[in-house]
C-alpha cells in the first residue's frame, strides 16, 4: 500500500490538528456541569454519553495525518482508564495543553529532545508531590463523596457504592450489570460463591425456591471422583452421629454413591447435598484449598496422603450456612478461621503481583474477593436504552474512582490539586541549567492550569479568572463548579483519587512528549472508494420479445 509522508513542522501541525479535534470533542464533558456528546451508531439508536474514553474511541478523522494525532490521544485516554479506571477526560485535556505549549516552543527553535527531558523531570517531581499530599480514605463519607463526584454528583450512586464497599470490604468484588427494571439496586452476595449447583434435584429442601439450605453444616472436600458409597461410609457414620447436614464437594459423584445419598436424604436418615468442585485442573485444586481454609477443613487428596477411606470428622470443614441452587453454591463461614484466611489472601496477593497474565490476574482477584467477604452487584436501571448505557458508564467510572481512592488516597478535586502543585516546580526549574529543560518544566506548569480552566468554562464561568483567583490560595481551597462558590473542597467533599490525578498526568505527558519529538509522519494512503457498477443495458431483456406472439404484427 502506498504511503503519505509529511516532514518537519508540517508533520507536527497535522498531529496537533488531530489532537485538538479529539480533545475538543471530549473536554466538553469535564466537571459537574460538563455537557453530553451524542454518538451516532451504525445500528440502533444514537448514544448520548458523558464518558471521555468512550467518546474518544468513537472518533476517526477523515485526514489520515490528523487521524494519527487523534489516535495518540485515544491511547492517553485508554491507558489512564486501564491504570486508574477514571480521569480520561483530564488526561486528554492535559495532553492537549502540553502539545499546544510544547509545539509553540519547538516552532520557536527549542530542542524537542531537551524539552522532553524537562517535561519528564517535571512529571517525576509532581508524582512525588501528589503522593505527599494524598490523604488516606478514612471513612464511608469520603467514599460516598468520591463516588458521587465521579458519577456526576449523583448522591444516590455515591451512597450505593459506599454501602457496597462497606459490605464486601475493599478486597471484595463489586460489579455493574444492566437491570431489567427501571430502578438501580444493590445486591450483595455474602460468603463464598461458585458456579456449581446440586447434582440432583432430590437434594432440594425448599420446593418453592428450588434451593438447598442448611444451617451449621459440615463440609467434605476432595479432588477425587466418588462412585462407590463404601468410600463415604466412615465419614457418613461420623456425620450421622453428629446430627448435622453434610455438603460434599468433589470432582464428581455418580452411580451408587449419588443414588445412596439421595435415598438417605429422602428417608430422612441423613441430610446431604453433593456438588461438583468448581473450575478445572490446578485452579480447581487452588479453589478447593481456599474453601478448606475458609471453613477450617482439609482437602482429601492423594497429593497430601489422604484418602476417603481414612477420612473422619476431623478433616471436615464447618460453615454457618449453605445455599445451593441448580447453578450456584454459596458458603457463609464464621470468623473462627480469620487468621488463616488472612494468610491465604496474602499468599494469593503475592501470586497476583507476580503474574503477567490479565486472565490470571482477574481470577486471582476473584479468589481474594470470595475469601475476603463476598460479591456486590449494582444492577443499573433506566427508562430507555440510551439513558441506561450512559448511567452504567457513570457508575463504572464512580466505582473505578473509589477503588483508586482506597488504593492511593485522595486529594482536593475540581482541578485545583494540579493548579496548586505548579508551585512545586519552581525549585526544580531554578535547579536546572539547560534553558530548554527549564522550558520543558514551564510547559508542564502552564498545562496544569488546563483542567481547572476547562471545568470552569463548562460551568459557564471565565476559566482564566477562576485560575487567577485560586493561584495563591491554600492547597485545599478551590472552585466548586456545581455551586459557583470558592471554598474548602475537602470540607465540601469534592475529592479526586490521587491515583487518577497521577495517572492522567503521567499518561498525558508521555504521549505529548512523543508528539513533540516527531519529525516525520508516515501514514497509509486512503484507498479510493470503489466506483458503483455502471448501469447495464438489461441485455437479457433485449427487444422485450414475448415468445409465442411473433405473429402479432402491426396491421
Swiss-Prot record:
Catalytic activity reported: ATP + H2O + a folded polypeptide = ADP + phosphate + an unfolded polypeptide
InterPro entries in the record: Chaperonin_Cpn60_CS, Cpn60/GroEL, Cpn60/GroEL/TCP-1, GroEL-like_apical_dom_sf, GROEL-like_equatorial_sf, TCP-1-like_intermed_sf
GO biological process terms, semicolon-separated: protein refolding
Keywords of this entry: ATP-binding, Chaperone, Cytoplasm, Isomerase, Nucleotide-binding
List of residues binding ATP: 29-32, 86-90, 414, 480-482, 496
CDD domains: GroEL (cd03344)
UniProt GO MF annotations: ATP binding; ATP-dependent protein folding chaperone; isomerase activity; unfolded protein binding
Enzyme Commission number, as recorded: 5.6.1.7
Claim: Secreted is one of the keywords in the record: no
Main location: cytoplasm
Localization (cell): Cytoplasm
Coiled coil (UniProt feature): none
GO cellular component annotations of the record: cytoplasm
Subunit organization: Forms a cylinder of 14 subunits composed of two heptameric rings stacked back-to-back. Interacts with the co-chaperonin GroES.
Cited function: Together with its co-chaperonin GroES, plays an essential role in assisting protein folding. The GroEL-GroES system forms a nano-cage that allows encapsulation of the non-native substrate proteins and provides a physical environment optimized to promote and accelerate protein folding.
Family in the record: Belongs to the chaperonin (HSP60) family.
HAMAP family according to UniProt: CH60
Record-given protein name: Chaperonin GroEL 2
Organism taxonomic ancestry: Bacteria, Bacillati, Cyanobacteriota, Cyanophyceae, Synechococcales
Gene this chain is encoded by: groEL2
